[in-house]
UniProtKB/Swiss-Prot annotation:
Enzyme Commission number(s) from the entry: 3.5.4.19
Biological or metabolic pathway of the protein: Amino-acid biosynthesis; L-histidine biosynthesis; L-histidine from 5-phospho-alpha-D-ribose 1-diphosphate: step 3/9
Record's protein name: Phosphoribosyl-AMP cyclohydrolase
Keyword Ribosomal protein part of the UniProt annotation: no
Necessary cofactors: Mg(2+); Zn(2+)
A GO BP entry: L-histidine biosynthetic process
Subunit details: Homodimer.
Reaction(s) the record says it catalyses: 1-(5-phospho-beta-D-ribosyl)-5'-AMP + H2O = 1-(5-phospho-beta-D-ribosyl)-5-[(5-phospho-beta-D-ribosylamino)methylideneamino]imidazole-4-carboxamide
Length: 139
């Protein structure tokens, strides 16, 4: 049984009410956008299932669901770069989350060792599309 109430058919209650009623997709997941609480930089996009969201709320440490490994994932548990949640928001229809976090340790969030998973820019030129390193990426 879910600790989160089901969404009512009343759209206004979902969009304007005070009840947190996350809407998980058909796979039982909700998208989580993660930014650095200090400077707002986009760090990563991940997914949470109900258990990951519950653990995040209970512990204050971000937990996610790994779609590739099909397992719960406490971000930074291996590297020491745990994500302490400073603020958690939901969007208007409660089907996406925004976590503002402080990253412990030496700071990389991406498994490649970079601060952000968004280190490449999509460039379209002369009918061709390619990836280039973003000018503000971290090594």
């Amino acid at each position: 049984m879910s600790i989160f109430p089901a969404q009512p058919s009343d759209k206004k209650a979902v969009e304007e009410g005070a009840a947190f009623m996350p809407r998980f997709d058909a796979s039982g997941l909700i998208t989580a956008i993660v930014t650095d609480a200090r400077d707002g930089e986009l760090l990563m996009v991940a997914h949470m299932n109900e258990e990951a969201l519950r653990l995040t709320l209970e512990t204050g440490i971000a937990h996610y669901w790994s779609r590739s490994r099909k397992t719960l994932w406490k971000k930074g548990e291996t590297s020491g770069n745990l994500q302490s949640v400073v603020e958690l928001r939901t969007d208007c229809d409660q089907d996406a989350l925004w976590l503002k976090v402080h990253v412990a340790g030496d700071g990389p969030t991406c498994h490649t060792g970079r601060r952000s998973c968004f280190y490449r820019q999509v460039v379209s030129s002369g009918g061709k599309v390619a990836l280039t390193m973003a000018s503000d990426h971290d090594q």
